[in-house]
């Protein structure tokens, strides 16, 4: 993942000697996690019962209140220790753009949510994703020697996009 300033001693995130990370490294972890739909399925759930079909169901509420109160927020991880304060790595998708935010050492959960909301609002108000080349766009047709077909189309594996400020003209990029 390229984590350069992280050393996890335990899986709980609780304070331990030589246990640390940075906002940037936490964003790299989040960037990998959001690639997995099952993760977002869990982290976007505000409340649910665990062990529903047993004699002792357990009601669980997501400590990331933004999942319930800010449309589009679908994760990701809250945390608190005396040393780290209130932390939140959040993610939200809107208009074909996903943003990841990280706040650390916040005073309380309200400040944690408010600062995260400010960052998300800023990002979505200022920036947009521009598709330069659609995955269905033929770049070139190539002749196939001794193939079952005479030609094949060269297309991008996935959409090719760039991040643009909304206030700027969309870039006209040719290939």
Model regions and ranges:
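Short loop/turn motifs enriched for small/polar and acidic residues
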Residues: 11
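Domain-terminus/edge residues, biased toward the C-terminal soluble/receptor-binding domains
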Residues: 3, 7, 15-175
């Amino acid at each position: 993942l390229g984590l350069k300033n992280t050393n996890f001693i335990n899986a709980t995130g609780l304070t331990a000697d030589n246990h640390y990370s940075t906002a940037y490294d936490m964003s790299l972890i989040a960037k990998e996690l959001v690639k997995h739909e099952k993760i977002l399925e869990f982290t976007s759930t505000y409340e649910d019962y665990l062990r529903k079909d047993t004699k002792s169901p357990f009601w669980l509420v997501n400590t990331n209140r933004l999942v319930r109160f800010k449309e589009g927020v679908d994760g990701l991880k809250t945390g608190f220790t005396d040393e780290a304060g209130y932390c939140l790595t959040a993610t939200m998708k809107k208009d074909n753009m996903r943003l990841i935010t990280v706040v650390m050492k916040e005073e309380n959960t309200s400040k944690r949510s408010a600062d995260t909301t400010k960052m998300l609002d800023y990002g979505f108000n200022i920036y947009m994703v521009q598709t330069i080349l659609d995955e269905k766009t033929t770049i070139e047709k190539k002749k196939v020697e001794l193939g079952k077909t005479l030609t094949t189309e060269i297309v991008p594996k996935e959409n090719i996009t760039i991040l643009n400020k909304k206030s700027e003209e969309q870039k006209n990029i040719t290939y």
